Amino acid sequence: GDNHDLWVNPKDGNIMVQSNDGGANVSFDGGRTWSSQDVQPTAEFYGVWLDNAFPYNLYMAQQDNSTYIVPSLNAPFNMDAVKTGPGCETGPIIPHPSDRNIIYGNCKGQFYVQNVAAGVTKAYWIGGQSLYGNDGGDLIYRMQRTTPMATSPHDPKVLYYGSQYLHLTRNNGVHWEKISPDLTAFPKCCQGGSGSPITR
């Protein structure tokens, strides 16, 4: 999705490269067939996080695709070594600081916990609501597209999550505490819906 550019080889019009938010696709037959985005190392990432393993792993939220976990020692590149994580394109995706089986993810305000050993991913709405189709003034918690999320450097059980408030969980997102006042100005002029009827 979200196509950006199309390059056509000036010496051979059958060779084309089409770039988009998810990476790039290549055609050698004038656009009749296209390669997968997974066959070349092209991507746009919202952010990259690392774990404490040795060798370490990279946790990445890829625009228009998904979240990925890639070992740092992956040369030559092997797609079979790439794992899918919790959340979606916006991320972030963050490893638990002391439990390598737990990975936190986010998708536009929805929080996820993946237990790698159990093969289970759980999703939670903080405040129990979807952000889609609602005016900002009607939301209990207003999340950014890329919702801030961070583990505590002092306590591995603590995870912070940001809306207009700062939230804290000690049990992988099952229960949340609101630990700050409203940190935004949020003037009345900005409390309506965003976008147009098509994008709402």
Segments the model singles out, each with a brief description of its role:
Residues 1-200:
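Beta-propeller blade termini and top-face loops
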